Amino acid sequence: MILILLKRLFGKAGCRRTSKKSLLQRNSFIIHAKGTSMARAHAEDLPWTAQNSPKGKYSLARRSLSMAAGGQKDIGTWGGGHPFDLEIHRIPPGKINFPQHEHSAQWEAYYILSGSGQVRGPKGKEAIKAGDYLVFPPGEAHQLINNGSEDLTYLVIADQPQADVIYYPDSGKWLVKPQRKCFEMNEADYFKGEE
């Protein structure tokens, strides 16, 4: 398997002239994996952690498989965490997962495990159901709405960029990760407070 990867990365000639060990030492993205071992978590062993907005419009419960397997919240390989985050989310009937938001750097993928509802995206609201796979690239606002009669459960896979700025178009708020600081932006002169 390693030889196949090396051939894809460097071509057959590069593999014949250079040892596998020296190639591994020269390529930092491969070195990150070197010396690590498999991490494991079982979803059914994890408690559901509830997250509700003060007035109850937004509500979900989550199981963080990545955190249970040794990952760090919003921290990728650049900070000693995992390269992606994996969670299971469950939205009760009549609730919404999060305020509509768009990431500047992070990709998110959702796989609907059970239930039905709507995704609110660039085309407005569209019906979703078990078996649907949704991919949200950076810059695309999205949210899930459970307008069904049972829980809407889905798998979330997200990469872990070193920094991500999240915009909430309905309220004009911003959030910066990994610091998780939320703010409203006010226009200011570039040199204000600098001299």
Q: What are these regions, as identified by a protein language model?
A:
Residues 123-138:
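Short acidic-glycine-tyrosine-enriched beta hairpin
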Residues 118, 138-164:
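Ligand-binding loop in jelly-roll beta-barrel domains
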